[in-house]
Design a protein with these regions (language model features):
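Mid-domain Rossmann-like dinucleotide-binding core that forms the NAD(H)/NADP(H) cofactor-binding site
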Residues: 1-78
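C-terminal hydrophobic helical "lid"/dimerization subdomain
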Residues: 88, 111, 164-225
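N-terminal Rossmann-fold cofactor-binding loop
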Residues: 52-55, 127, 150
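C-terminal substrate-binding/catalytic core of Rossmann-like NAD(P)-dependent dehydrogenases/reductases
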Residues: 81-86, 90, 94, 133-184, ...
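ADP-ribose/adenylate-binding Rossmann-like module
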Residues: 115-133
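Residue-level detector of alpha-helix initiation sites
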Residues: 30-32, 107-108, 130
């Protein structure tokens, strides 16, 4: 999420240089989307953050992490239009966000991001790669930058310094108390229930499901003794 947040900086910087208030939309508020929101608010504080989240608990977390506008995912395009003052031209907004982070990863979500990112804006794809089908006509006509953000690297910070993503993630996790995103822990040998919980995390009111290897190690030692 931190990596994706900082990938918006070129578009944000260009908006600031033009005297505009930079707008960044985040589509999806699972663990990756929420971490992107935290990264934006911490490291790119100039932005106005608009979030589309499917579930009420995701919406609440998004607000607590610093999002300015939070709406159900289906209403994100309308919220972007209202905040940016853009108009619908065909399937696209005439204005829209300066940058958008897609934290869903489906064909529909990527197309939505392309539609409400302004011309010469930037769409950042966050998460695991997959095969998708897209109509890229608007990308060419509007000269949109489509950027992938995967895991980590050496980040170019807005102040010109270089930082490692892991260092930034550790700082953000502590300062934003991201441990509250952990909804349940499981022993490693209880992986079937853990995976089932993770698969239905959103509708079950959960965000992040994790394994507690300490519990598994303690049990193994006890059985060995």
């Amino acid at each position: 999420g931190i990596h994706a947040a900082l990938a918006t900086w070129p578009a944000v910087q260009a908006a600031i240089q033009r005297g505009e208030t930079p707008i960044v939309a985040v589509l999806g508020a699972g663990s990756m989307g929420l971490c992107a929101i935290a990264g934006l608010r911490r490291y790119v504080p100039q932005v106005r953050i608009i979030v589309g989240a499917r579930y009420p608990h995701q919406q609440a977390f998004a607000r607590s992490l610093g999002a300015d506008v939070v709406v159900p995912a289906a209403e994100l395009a309308r919220a972007v239009r209202r905040e940016s003052g853009g108009h619908i031209v065909g399937d696209y907004l005439s204005g829209g966000c300066h940058a958008t982070i897609d934290a869903v990863g489906s064909s529909d979500s990527i197309m939505d991001c392309l539609k409400f990112t302004r011309p010469r804006g930037r769409v950042v794809l966050l998460g695991m790669p997959a095969v998708v089908s897209l109509d890229l006509t608007g990308l060419w006509h509007r000269e949109t930058a489509l950027i992938g953000a995967y895991t980590y690297g050496t980040e170019s910070m807005p102040d010109g310094t270089k930082r490692h993503t892991f260092d930034l993630a550790i700082e953000t996790a502590a300062d934003c108390q991201l441990n509250r995103l952990v909804s349940a822990t499981y022993r490693l040998d209880d992986y079937q229930n853990a995976l089932a919980h993770a698969a239905g995390a959103g509708r079950r009111g959960a965000v992040k499901i994790v394994f507690d290897l300490r519990a598994s190690d303690a049990r193994n030692k006890k059985e060995t003794n």
